[in-house]
A protein has these predicted regions:
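PLP-dependent class I/II
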Residues: 1-161
Length: 161
């Protein structure tokens, strides 16, 4: 098992990943690879941050999950009522895929509308492969007021299409 508290608790940069490897041969091979790549050091800050997150972060995490669920429902409801954008409800993440294929657009035009008209920058679907054509990914890990502003800009832009 390879894991870290990085994304869940927003402590990236603290060198806090860890491995649980029961098989002694695999563990030794893994340790050798870490040493060869100069990735074997433990960060005191990362260790403490991970321990604090796992030990004391449960209530905070439950509250965060509720905030994200509220944000997801907001995006689904707004775009479902106000646009032809299909929202793919995420599972276990704060990244939502938006499907713009109901509009008669090219990928280039979609990006131009988002950037120049709506004044938002989303992850281009094509960056994830051809099946991402006419899709974009929005990160909802932001204050609700900012999410509302971003989504309202998108709604206003695509109301004209």
């Amino acid at each position: 098992v390879l894991s870290s508290a990085t994304k869940t608790f927003n402590i990236a940069g603290t060198k806090n990943s860890y491995a649980v490897i029961e098989n002694p041969k695999l563990r030794l091979a893994f340790q050798k690879r870490l040493l060869a790549n100069n990735q074997h050091e433990i960060s005191g800050l990362g260790y403490l941050a991970t321990e604090a997150a796992y030990r004391y972060g449960k209530d905070w995490l439950e509250e965060l999950k509720q905030v994200f669920e509220d944000h997801i429902n907001y995006v689904v409801d707004l775009f479902g009522k106000e646009t032809k954008i299909k929202v793919m409800k995420p599972q276990g993440t704060y990244l939502i895929w938006l499907d713009f294929s109901a509009y008669d657009l090219t990928d280039e035009t979609l990006q131009e509308l988002l950037r120049n008209e709506a004044k938002v920058i989303l992850n281009r679907g094509l960056d994830f492969g051809e099946e991402g054509s006419l899709h974009a990914r929005i990160n909802i890990a932001m204050p609700k007021s900012l999410l509302q502003e971003v989504c309202q800009r998108i709604v206003a832009t695509f109301a004209k299409c």
